[in-house]
Amino acid sequence: MTVSTFNRTWAKVIVNALLRYGVKHFCIAPGSRSTPLTLEALQLQQNQQAQCHSHFDERGLGFFALGIAKVTNDPVAIIVTSGTAVANLYPAVIEASLTHHKLIVLSADRPPELIGCGANQAIPQQGIFADYPIAGVNLPKPAEHYNAGWLVATIEQACVTQSQQGGVIHINAPFAEPLYEADENAIGTHPWLKPIQSWLINPQTKWINSQTIQSEVSMHENWDYWRTKRGVIVVGKLPVEQGIGIKAWAETLGWCLITDVQSCVDANLPYADIWLSNNTVHQRLLQADIVIQFGGQIVSKRVNKFLEAFKGEFWQVDEYSDYLNPFAHHQTRFVAKAHHFLRVHPPLRQKPWLLEPLALSQFCAGFIEQQVGGSLNEASLAHHIEEVLATSGNLFIGNSLFVRLVDALCKLPEGYPVYTNRGASGIDGLIATMAGVAKGSGQPTVGVIGDISALHDLNSVSLLNKISHPCILFVINNSGGAIFDMLPVEAQAKEQFYRLSHNYEFAPIATMFGIEYIRPFTWADLKAKLKLAYGRKGVTIVEIKVNDQDGSNLYKSLVKQISQAEIA
């Protein structure tokens, strides 16, 4: 058998191991060294066993894969060639690692004899992602003296680790030339495959049958005591299914419920980021005996300040075993899904122990509406974001100012899926992630990002052409990084080194990539054009051009005025 044919046979085993693990999507960047992996992934697509996606920019491709992984909860494979192509996946690897989404990086490599000798496009790739992957596999150059069963077992063992912990696997696969002109008829019939032939012909068969670790949570030994006390529940980022029941549980206990925009839990005390600026309410909330926090990655600065200031009994509930304790609490930690925790901690019906947050939250609803006004701007879009969403769809929110405005000013429908990149909270790859969420879900998706984020990920506008159902990408153009208006930095330095003001507009970008584009000036105009956009099969870019400091100024004004409100 020729080298090129055995390369393909070796790659066939790798991609089939991933198929049996649950990979349904292969995201592929162009490259020569990865040809064996690419062609075998395409073979799965031709057999209608998987979908293949392509993109010319590995950084965007990584985030596109992350978006698919977010919405499907399935592992997603990424195939790239050798060299800096691998390094371009680093931001997506970091984000997926911190949020436990399952990415599998398949990096093709030069064979060992070409590393460290000046060969073209050859860099040390083993361990390139440092400690971010939860499993790393550095395969040898394909050779028949390695047992085929060993190759399957090596891949599947890494997958078993990922199935239990989430996160990223890095599989580095060297291939020697030649890479082309393989004997297609010999790829699947080589005697080397004989030990795994029954596995290979049955897509449902796994080489390693591992049982998922069952970590049943037990009721806290003092729950009967703590459920009679004054409590506050804080809900951070949660999957939709885990948020079900938290609101009713909190209301039965009579405890205050504070929810993050990523929680997918209906807020009975919305606008917490605003009303917690009031020191009287903040201090009364600190009189709680116990705080229970579900999930993490909380957006609100004032909610985080409350958590930092609280010194009582603190319980943290999260399905992963990561150390979540930014404020060094003496805490009790439950490694459990939220709904599993609720099941074994039945509530005791009590009257609410603190009414001021409810009263101030209700006041904020009318006050915010009055302050935001009827103009179309970033604050009013955040406050009324529900009005631009599809009935059954997704919301993807970028980072920086807008996610804070949504968290502070809006009340989303119960259980509406919200996606973010709040693991490392970077602005890279946001368009690509939104495209992945839309592609992976097949549902109408609204994404909202800032202008600097859009400029940072401009290549990924190309990915929007892969979406064939109605989706809306809002670009809030405040001519720079408005989030930095919140910083106490001297004006000239802020302008030149933080804000980076510009005069760019996004209509020419939409034209270049062949994407529908609208620029509304009023809410009536927006709603009329959105009706048309939701009737199209594809993505529409909506540019909202706003004054550079309006959003940040309104945000600061709301916080200041509520902080000064008199509370009896």
Curated annotation (Swiss-Prot):
The gene is menD. GO terms for biological process: menaquinone biosynthetic process. Homodimer. Its EC number is 2.2.1.9. Binds 1 thiamine pyrophosphate per subunit. The keyword Magnesium applies. This is 2-succinyl-5-enolpyruvyl-6-hydroxy-3-cyclohexene-1-carboxylate synthase. It comes from Actinobacillus pleuropneumoniae serotype 7 (strain AP76). Belongs to the TPP enzyme family. MenD subfamily. One of its GO terms (molecular function) is thiamine pyrophosphate binding. Pathway: Quinol/quinone metabolism; 1,4-dihydroxy-2-naphthoate biosynthesis; 1,4-dihydroxy-2-naphthoate from chorismate: step 2/7; Quinol/quinone metabolism; menaquinone biosynthesis. Catalyzes the thiamine diphosphate-dependent decarboxylation of 2-oxoglutarate and the subsequent addition of the resulting succinic semialdehyde-thiamine pyrophosphate anion to isochorismate to yield 2-succinyl-5-enolpyruvyl-6-hydroxy-3-cyclohexene-1-carboxylate (SEPHCHC). Keywords: Magnesium, Manganese, Menaquinone biosynthesis, Metal-binding, Thiamine pyrophosphate, Transferase. InterPro entries: MenaQ_synth_MenD, MenD_middle, THDP-binding, Thiamin_PyroP_enz_TPP-bd_dom, TPP_enzyme_TPP-bd. Its cofactor is Mg(2+); Mn(2+); thiamine diphosphate.
